[in-house]
């Protein structure tokens, strides 16, 4: 059985936690239609490295955790998420992988501090929802990476439609190109591209960078 670690005391739920308490039930059934590039990112990571210790920040329902376990059968995987409801889904989804998977209920506002570090830190459609906080998350990821380790990101990038940007803001997403400059400055880019979704309604970013 996989492990869930939770702090002994918790503050009141945030707006984001309340948002995902309901969305956890429908997340996997709906997000395929607009969270593009997730499977492709895992495939590309596998062409660059063979990580044995991996961390996903904002692991949600565990879709990527299960994918990492299948692609890297010798690896140990840790997932961190602020939503108990999403972690409950992730626990069911990753049970077949047993003790290889550890789930942690916490914010990622400071490094986990594992002495061995991680070969890969993955952020999949998470950083754009950390507002404020994505800068802090990137600093924590850099500290948690082992020497030579990589940060892998797929996320919303930008849109030229103000109405769509405002709507995404209602759903806690910031998408005004804020992530790419920080990623390029903080990590050595190995993959760094922006692609259009739905004919250019918005763009999404795929980035893999090595720890400097």
Regions found by a protein language model. Name each.
Residues 120-133:
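A short SAM/SAH-binding and catalytic strip from SAM-dependent methyltransferases
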Residues 149-156:
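Conserved beta-strand signature within the Rossmann-like core of class I S-adenosyl-L-methionine
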Residues 135-147:
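A short glycine-rich, Lys/Arg-flanked "PGG" loop and its adjoining helix->strand segment in the class I
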Residues 32-50:
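Conserved alpha-helix/loop element of class I SAM-dependent methyltransferases that forms part
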Residues 111-121:
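A short acidic, Gly/Pro-enriched loop at the edge of an enzyme's catalytic core
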Residues 55-57, 61-110:
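Class I SAM-dependent methyltransferase SAM/SAH-binding core
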